[in-house]
Amino acid sequence: MSGELNGNDTPTQAAMPAVGVPESVAFAEDAEQHNESMKTLVLGALGVVYGDIGTSPIYAFREALHAAASDGILARSDILGVVSLIFWALTLVVTIKYVLFVLRADNNGEGGILSLMALVRGALKGRPDLILGVGICGAALFFGDAVITPAISVLSAMEGLEIVAPDLTPFVVPITVVILVTLFSVQKLGTGKVAIVFGPIMALWFLALGASGLWHIFDDPTVMVALNPYYAVRFLMISPGIAFITVGAVFLAMTGAEALYADLGHFGRKPIVRAWLWIVFPCLLLNYFGQAAFILSHGEAAALPFFQMMPSFALLPMVLLATAATVIASQAVITGAYSVARQAVQLNILPRLEIQHTSEKLHGQIYIPRVNLLLGLAVVILVLGFEKSSNLAAAYGIAVTGNMLVTTVLLYIVMTRIWNWRVSRALPIIVGFLIIDIMFFGANIIKVHEGGWASIGIAAILVLIMWTWVRGTRHLFNKTRKAEVPLDLIVQQMTKRPPTIVPGTAVFLTGDPKSAPTALMHSLKHYKVLHENNVILTVVTASKPWVSSADRARVSQYNERFMQVTLTFGYMQQPNIPRALGICRKLGWKFDIMTTSFFLSRRSLKASAHSGLPLWQDKLFILLARTASDATEYFQIPTGRVVEIGTQVNL
């Protein structure tokens, strides 16, 4: 296998300059193409990665000022303290923690909390359940964030209508609901055709942020003294109680920072970093400092400073641009939710889900109907229940701070176990990050009664579902394994006393390659026949995102009648069994789909008082198993080649 070549195995020819072309010219052309490609990726990152954090100026500074003025007084020192906190939070958390460290902790180029969990589980063999639990919590918090982001983003943009036309205030929530329902309704059509405009629109958005902020900085240029951390520290120390509440609101300026890591696989580290350092970070800072300067010179403008500082002729266009930006931010989060859900299914944290591909060219563009429906319903319910973006702000921070806290914990394991850093080197950095994360998490967790319960409730329900699925599948595996016959024994018996042999190939899917598949045993028991060729097939998900076709299949022969095939897929890949079995032709097995039957076991589960799991968890697991997508569709097996054999199992 290692000696075989594929279409990508001739890099030396591709790297050589064209014959007759001076080397300097060839390299100049390569450099120009590289620069154009980099610009495209940077523009793409603006549209996907930075939509969430890019729309934070609409509400983050406003909420932080409201918290700082909770004692009824908003002094100049409060305004400078808040903008200084935002500047240093963005610098320490996004620029240093994520850009310098977290983005380097990729799993074969992929990012995201489940990728990080899989990477750490592969490196830390001793405590797999602990790491799995941490990863499940992180994934649940991500889904909580995915519910809140579209609601607060679009709602905050629509609130700009209150400035444009106060008479439209009663219609803010209905218009928001219409936009969100439309957004979720068109997901099944795919986003490939419209995604091409996301980057340019977000580039225009960031330029508008920077320009409007820069213009108003001249209202009071002394606002720039807030770059000095003295003002942030002074604000924290003068009124610790009010400052602690304000810190929770300041964190809203960083919501979306986790997207830098989650979308790492789509764009790569360099485009994400360059987009942040060249465009996003400078434009965000200009806007926040511009809002601060505007309020310093117009003290009465703290209600909706983002829209109030716009000139009258630009107000309506800015509301429309903000709406487009928040829809794009919502789309990025929805797409991210699909990706995380697929990873969770592949890692066996969730039951199989129907996954539809919306693009023939881009395999990453998927649509998951069940996730879309549940996410859409939850978002609309939040909008109708909370009605104002300021009410949702309390719910927003908990999910994101929790996700960041989980990321920091896993990052420490990456540093010490994968990067092989000494503890004395890694610990001070991680402790610094943990202090910041815990401070933000603590400042947000006290808002449970104000709306934080929604975020915690969503995450808790998802943790319960995922952990029940993990425990239930393990229990079912152990229970069925005790009752099953070792495969070696069946092979020996069939060799000594073979039943009637029928032509063709039978493929038996099983999760336990050491035991005889249930479908095989029932076939022998009821039909008393054995196929000419019998394949015991196991599908394995690797702890890395992508597995090459060269490493896809492993074949071992028991005897002339039985062989074992193991197919390995990455957790970002959609299993296609017929296509993968075609690779086995190179390994000596002449696979022919037209003479092959696939035998699948369909278990009917029943709750049992003696299962070892609580009865309620038994029933929840059974419900999840019943809602799982059909294995035939999930593994993309032609329905005409499938034989399903049903069995009943008492948990």
Curated annotation (Swiss-Prot):
It is a multi-pass membrane protein. It catalyses: K(+)(in) + H(+)(in) = K(+)(out) + H(+)(out). One of its GO terms (molecular function) is potassium ion transmembrane transporter activity. It holds the Pfam family K_trans. The chain crosses the membrane at residues 41-61, 82-102, 130-150, 163-183, 194-214, 235-255, 276-296, 309-329, 366-386, 395-415, 426-446, 450-470. One of its GO terms (cellular component) is plasma membrane. It is found in: Cell inner membrane. Its main location: membrane. Keywords: Cell inner membrane, Cell membrane, Ion transport, Membrane, Potassium, Potassium transport, Symport, Transmembrane, Transmembrane helix, Transport. Transport of potassium into the cell. Likely operates as a K(+):H(+) symporter. PANTHER family: LOW AFFINITY POTASSIUM TRANSPORT SYSTEM PROTEIN KUP (PTHR30540:SF79), OSMOTIC STRESS POTASSIUM TRANSPORTER (PTHR30540). Belongs to the HAK/KUP transporter (TC 2.A.72) family. This is Probable potassium transport system protein Kup. It comes from Brucella anthropi (strain ATCC 49188 / DSM 6882 / CCUG 24695 / JCM 21032 / LMG 3331 / NBRC 15819 / NCTC 12168 / Alc 37). The gene is kup.
